């Protein structure tokens, strides 16, 4: 299981400061760049993180018509990121079109599909998608696997189930991890490290519990040690 840190600080300077503080762990860590950081800091920020030796996950959750998604995927691949995501609900044609566009790259980024945002409660999810999170997560995972994607973004509660219906090597990445039971904030379906490991999660994403900690480096060390222990 790998640790991916969400760089969601209010300034580029704060994000770079954190990345520099953790540089000795660059080979063990992934850094997630989301909407806020990418819109504000752009491609140059990605390059700076890559120069420090980090693996970068660009979290933009592409969702559009197939050709537009494929165009965006190509530009993302050109940035040199190591992983990015799309929405599974964009549909099979869109997912396949994205993967076909990336075939020309000798080393392409990993592509994951978002099943259900971890901020959703089951009740809220049903109002929009007409079914339970569990059922739709299964459906979206199968769809993504059949389209040739590398994995999905899901909560820890769906991870093992998804691997059982797709492939053990099909990647699951889980946001909203609260390593040691920290406040859930705006996340509805959170998990700690032990549950994530038990559910065979491949990547855990941790943001606020690290970058809001008084000693982020010590917190990261504690998380990495916990991952190795279990």
UniProtKB/Swiss-Prot annotation:
Q: Does the keyword Cell wall biogenesis/degradation apply?
A: no
Q: Drop me one GO molecular function for this one.
A: orotidine-5'-phosphate decarboxylase activity
Which Gene Ontology terms of cellular component type are present? cytosol
Give the record's keywords alphabetically: Decarboxylase, Lyase, Pyrimidine biosynthesis
Active-site residues per Swiss-Prot or TrEMBL entry: 61 (proton donor)
The record lists the catalysed reaction(s) as:
orotidine 5'-phosphate + H(+) = UMP + CO2
Residues the entry annotates as binding substrate: 8, 32, 59-68, 118, 178, 187, 207-208
As recorded in UniProt, its EC number(s) are: 4.1.1.23
Pathway(s) annotated for this protein in UniProt? Pyrimidine metabolism; UMP biosynthesis via de novo pathway; UMP from orotate: step 2/2
Keyword Lyase among record annotations: yes
Q: Which PROSITE patterns match?
A: OMPDECASE
Which enzyme class, named as a word? Answer: lyase
Query: Which Gene Ontology terms describe the biological processes this protein takes part in?
Result: 'de novo' pyrimidine nucleobase biosynthetic process; 'de novo' UMP biosynthetic process
**Annotated signal peptide:** none
Q: Which NCBIfam families match?
A: PRK00230.1, pyrF
Instruction: Cite the PANTHER family for this sequence.
Output: OROTIDINE 5'-PHOSPHATE DECARBOXYLASE
Family (UniProt): Belongs to the OMP decarboxylase family. Type 1 subfamily.
* Quaternary structure and interacting proteins, as annotated: Homodimer.
Task: Give the protein's biological function.
Answer: Catalyzes the decarboxylation of orotidine 5'-monophosphate (OMP) to uridine 5'-monophosphate (UMP).
Protein name listed in UniProt: Orotidine 5'-phosphate decarboxylase
* Species for this entry: Nautilia profundicola (strain ATCC BAA-1463 / DSM 18972 / AmH)
């Amino acid at each position: 299981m790998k640790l991916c840190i969400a760089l969601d600080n209010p300034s580029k300077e704060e994000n770079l400061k954190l990345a520099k503080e953790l540089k000795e762990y660059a080979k063990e860590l992934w850094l997630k760049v989301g909407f806020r950081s990418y819109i504000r800091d752009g491609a140059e920020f990605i390059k700076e993180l890559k120069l420090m030796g980090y693996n970068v996950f660009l979290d933009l959750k592409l969702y559009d018509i197939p050709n537009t998604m494929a165009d965006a995927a190509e530009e993302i691949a050109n940035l040199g990121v190591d992983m990015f995501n799309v929405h599974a609900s964009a549909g099979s044609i869109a997912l396949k079109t994205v993967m076909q566009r990336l075939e020309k790259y000798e080393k392409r980024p990993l592509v994951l599909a978002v099943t259900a945002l971890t901020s959703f409660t089951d009740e809220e999810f049903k109002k929009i998608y007409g079914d339970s999170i569990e059922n739709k997560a299964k459906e979206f995972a199968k769809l993504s696997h059949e389209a040739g994607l590398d994995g999905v973004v899901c909560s820890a509660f769906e991870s093992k189930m998804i691997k059982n219906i797709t492939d053990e090597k099909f990647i699951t990445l889980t946001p909203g991890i609260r390593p040691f039971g920290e406040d859930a904030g705006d996340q509805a379906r959170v998990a700690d490290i032990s549950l994530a490991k038990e559910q065979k999660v491949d990547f855990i994403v941790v943001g606020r519990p690290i970058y809001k900690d008084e000693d982020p480096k010590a917190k990261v060390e504690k998380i990495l040690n916990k991952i190795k222990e279990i």
